[in-house]
């Protein structure tokens, strides 16, 4: 199985049950690349002596022969076996995984990464935009021993069980939350669809016990509302496989409400599925190229739009320094065609494509395989998309809910409407 996807530039501190606090998840889908399996591991001597056969021609051999690699690994393992103080605690499987992970990371590419089985499962779950759980977002403040529910999805098992944003979770089934990290607590809450989980929460001075039946939850990646003067506001948190349908439904709803202009908010959107972002742009752009992708051999693929659904109303796209990858494909294309104005600050600057390959045993390799270019031929890698209207975010202590960047984007749209 191969997928081409986009990596995340930042970690999350608030996690739906399908999120990992320390992962850099990639997103997207492009076809046609090939990945070579670069390592095979065998375990000898009761699991204590590991021998690795490095294959793959010039990509793996370099100036060091296969025999040299094997001899050095044999020596390292012999030294561990002979002298290592904590020999009884050695996990042979973990050593194997460390070889694979280190091999990928030694490329020095921040977007190339090896995923073990557990990480790969979470990765694929995240990419699909669906997970099995109760439909709640959890957060844990730095140094805090408690876990707070910050969001409950509408009509989710959590909602039906009566959980509310602000509830403090202190026990999951028989597990005490105090002293545990957020990722561990999330893993307790998750589980197979149809199974029950008992949660104990504090709400004000009251302690409550609720039971929720886990179900398949679709991550809500699109939020929208109508602002004053019939200006629609549509926020996209990431480009998952479920995002296109949510985006299309949001556009239709805003149109039905009499929308005369639109703000699309991509701030803090780390990227996502390439098919998703190109499909979304086909609802906005005129006929032409959406994005071009060039591999190491110079082969180029153009993804195009037929222009049948071109958006002609005033449009502003909000971005910031954490708008990355697929978000930059979106904003770059809108900017190149003049479909709307880009408002905010220069984006992250990730203009490369990763391919995700199943290594056959449930583990995956994510490998950078191509660079992408906006419709005008711009590479934004390491550069980002510069806004048409630059606005730095300013926090207002007197009004924490104030958003000067959004206010400016609305002003831009309003001016175009006049």
What role is predicted for each listed range?
Residues 36, 62, 66, 129-171, ...:
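PDZ/PDZ-like domain segments forming the peptide/carboxylate-binding groove
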Residues 15-18, 150, 159-161, 165, ...:
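Cleft-lining beta-strand/loop regions that shape enzyme active-site pockets
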Residues 1, 9, 50-57, 259, ...:
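Intrinsically disordered, low-complexity repeat and linker tracts
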Residues 81-148, 196-197, 204-211, 418:
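Extended, small/polar residue-biased N-terminal targeting/export presequences
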Residues 2-111:
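Terminal targeting/pro-maturation regions of precursor/exported proteins
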Residues 70-73, 77-81, 96-104, 108, ...:
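Extracytoplasmic/secreted envelope proteins and their assembly/folding machinery
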Residues 354-358, 365-396:
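Conserved P-loop NTPase
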Residues 216-224, 378, 391-399:
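Short, surface-exposed linear segments at secondary-structure transitions and domain or protein termini
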